[in-house]
Amino acid sequence: MNQNQISSYINQANEELEAATLLLEKNYYRACISRCYYAIYCTVQALLIVKNINTRSHRGVRQQFSQHFIQTGELPLELSKALRITYDLRQLGDYDQVIEITREQTQIA
């Protein structure tokens, strides 16, 4: 387990969450969702490193998180759902310029 990597991911997660809060206050919903996703992503990466699991893709992070934390019952299913929903919203916000992202969707993230 690399404590420096874990600390780095946790620090980045906190920074992303703080940025998301500021973006929500300014009604920048697309950017807010993206920052929310990365806050969760960094937190999950830190958890995976604790178990000496390294991944190189977003999909791998979601799969490994589910396998090692959700399916084992160590963490509740709702966390996996939150990761998936936030990932899906980020994909829409980042890559589908036609769709409108609402405050309600942002608050789900």
Where are these regions (language model features)?
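Terminal alpha-helical segments
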Residues: 1-109
